[in-house]
Each structure stands twice: as C-alpha cells, then as structure tokens.
Amino acid sequence: ASSAASDVYKRQVGQSKDNEYYLRRLLDGTWNIAGTLFMDYRNAADCSDLHTIIYGHNMKNNTMFGSLPKYSKQEYYEEHSVLYLLTPKQNYKVKLIAGYVTPSDSKVYEFEKTKEERSGLLKTALDNSLFTSGTTVSDEDRLLTLSTCSYEYDNARFVLMGILKEIG
C-alpha cells in the first residue's frame, strides 16, 4: 500500500507479524534509522477493518510522519483536511476528523469490540482534537489512524484520525 497526503506522505506502507519489525527497517529489510511506515499487525491488509492504524517515525526533517504534529493547528488542518490512501486493490479518501496527543498505551491502539467502546474512542478523539473538523461520524464509518511519536511527555504520541471512504 502507499499513502499520499497533500504530497506529504507519499510513501509505501509495510506490515509485519508484529509492530517492531519496520521501526528501523526499510521494506526490503535493510536497517534504516527512519524505518518504514507500517500498518498495525492486527489489521487486515486490505483496510477492511473498522479501525486501521498506520505508524511512522516523527522525523525532524519532516519525512515519514514528521509533519503530522502540524495538525495541532486549525489553519493547517483547514488547508490539509483530506488524505488519500492508495492500495493495489482499492483507493481511499480520508476525511480527517481529529488530531491529538495521547499516551502510547491509549485506548486508540486497542481494537474496539463493542459499539460502546467505539463510541468511547470517537468521543475521546473528538473531545481531545486540536482542530475542529465539524464532520459527523457514524458507527459504520471505517477509521484510519496515523500515529507518530510526540514529545510533550514520556511515551506521548500524536494521532491523526479520519474516515476512510472507498473511491474509484
């Protein structure tokens, strides 16, 4: 899969049997400090889950997910409110709904099993978002979360969440 966001995240996305493999590896397996963007190992590779998570390093040179924290500003969100996820089988438009800082052990990284858990995830995301999207989210909407390290406190993460819609 490759992901493109306002020409910011034009990168291929890997997936492994765990969430460690691509932290410091390129898609071909060679060591690299920046690693590779990668999908959570628990997700279906075809993005068919209700909640798909993609991780990437917050690189100071704005590569990988280094520019994700720019979504802490309303103005940046307004100029970049839509992303595109392009995969070999299906392309998706992602309407962003929330961006916020959360601990690495946050419930956003758990896969909700009940409607109540999903509602709680969405409420937390929207209540903590550093921008206002004004977008209504339904229980049937599939979500994409992009996650990167953040430095407000130990083990902080910046997450950017959006609604995943098939296109084309």
Give residue spans per PLM region.
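Single conserved hydrophobic/aromatic residue that forms the stacking wall/gate
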Residues: A1-A5, Y9
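Extracytoplasmic/periplasmic soluble domains downstream of a signal peptide or transmembrane helix
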Residues: G14-G168
